[in-house]
Structure formats: structure tokens, C-alpha cells
């Protein structure tokens, strides 16, 4: 990958240009940030009896540990993990949209929404989550953090639907 001004060109290992459409880096970073927001909301808020520990571990590659721990503590206090383990409750989060995005000094301040669906037996409940955070660019790590963003600050607010 070669960055020329605001364009990105793709070359193979022999240095030959590959037939790819050049893309505006701002648009590329916006798409990568949207993917990062989606992954962050998913791994922080989606779990069942088999996936809760793995999803928590994955989330720590996407968002700061203190902010992730605060969200995990809320679920623990609300007995969500207990319900998943003992009653088979399933929590699934789906990204909706970016509400606002601004960039200053290499930091991306973003507000976005997602919907958490909680399935507990025959009961289903939906909660809209409004997330706000400041993300920075980092080196991508496969498979933990493929977007190359990391939330330095992050918080969530919940609205019952």
C-alpha cells in the first residue's frame, strides 16, 4: 500500500500497481471507524453463556480497559451475566449508525447508536445504546483489531425501546 497525498494505491510484492480504484483516505478512515464502532458495540454488549468471556477479552483490544470494565460492571450489577449463565439469556448488539463524527489532531470524536436485543426465554427486550468516544489510529492487529482504531475514551447511555 502506498499513500500518495490523499490517495492510496495498492501494489503487489513485486512493486507492480494492482488494478484498484484509488480511494480518498478520509473516506477510508471513516469506513474503518464505522467498522470499529460496530465491533466495539458488539463485543462490549453481545454475549451468551458460551461467549461472554471471549467477547470481553476481544473488547479490550478495541477500547480502553477502564471504560470497558465500567460497562462490564454494569452488566454484572444488572445480573445480565448471571441471567446468561443460569437462565440462557442471549444479548445481541447490532450497530445502527454514526450520529456525529469530528476529527481534530488525529483524534476521532464519534457518537453512534446501536440496538441491544435481550432474549430471555420467551421474553424479548430492546435497548438503544448511544455510545460516545474518542478514537485514535493504531496499528491493526489481526484478528483482534482489524480496523486500526482504538477508543481512548468511551461511554454508553441506554434507552429502553
Language model regions located:
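Structured, amphipathic secondary-structure segments that form assembly/contact surfaces
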Residues: 1-8, 13-31, 45, 50-161
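Solvent-exposed, amphipathic alpha-helical segments
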Residues: 36-47
